[in-house]
Structure formats: structure tokens, C-alpha cells
Amino acid sequence: MTTATDFAKQLRRFLSEYLSHERNVSPNTLSAYRDAFVQYIAYMHTKKGVAVEKLFLKHLTRQNVIGYLNWILDERNCSPATRNYRLAAIHAFVSFLQYNIIEQSEEWQKILSIKAMRTEKKALNYLSQDSIRLLLHQPDVTIWQGRRHLAMLSLMYDTGARVQEIADLTVTASASIVSLTR
């Protein structure tokens, strides 16, 4: 029976205890960080020949992290924004390690000195007034589903809410948002 490596133990503590309980991050953040480390482990296995059961904290070096980030860009064809998200996950883990594995503080500082890439901000495209008017005239208001669709489209237009935010609305939540008057 093999025992977990120091990398595996610290990563489990980071994901299961620190992020979940101490930092109370969202499930989406937790999932994104987990994905970043699944990819890092895959990189270390395929490119560095280090199997997951032999992956130790000594393998978490500035050189390996930079290699991983370049691999994301060059071989996985990810965007600089994705690279930056993966780097943020590694930075968070290394910041956690600074207080738990102080013997390697010098290496942790080197990893934390890796900078994010500059990314281009994408311009938002907006619908013209004519396009919005056309969109709001699409639902068939002679049937209840059409009136419902028009109400949801109007609410999204008037509030700037996203589709998921509208989908997540409940009657009790909408009661505090909408006030009906006679």
C-alpha cells in the first residue's frame, strides 16, 4: 500500500479544507482550481515523466510552472486568459503552502513572482434599438407562453440580468424585486 505524497496531501487540504471552509469560495472557483491541478498533474506526467504517485512538492518549481503555462498556450491552444486563470490557481495554492511548508519559502516566492500575461479586452457588442424592438416583438402574446417569454425578455432588458440570473429567480426572490401597485 502506497501512502499519499506531500503534494497530494497538501493539495487535498488546499481544495477540501482551505478553499471550501476557510475561504468559502464558490463551487465554480473550486472546480476551476481543481481543473488547473488536474492539468498540471497531466503536464507533469506527459512532459516531465513524473507519475501522479511520485509527484512531490519538490516538483512544484518555477521552471515546471512556467513549462506548464507554456504547454497550456502552445500545445493545448488555450488563450492567455485561460493561462492566467491557471496561474491564479497555482498562486493561491503556493500562497497556502507558504504558511504550511515554510522550508521551501524561497521556491514559493519564485513561483509567486510569475506574472500574468496581458490580455486584450474584448469589446462588448450591443443590439441596436431596432434589433431590441424586433426581439421583443417575437413572442406570440396571444398565448400564455408568449406572454411569459415577453415578460422574461423585458425583465432581462430592463434590469440587465443574465439568462441564468432570470432562471434562478424564485417567487420569494422576485417579491423583493418587483412591487405591484393598483
Each language-model region and where it sits:
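Conserved catalytic core of the tyrosine transesterase superfamily
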Residues: 1-182
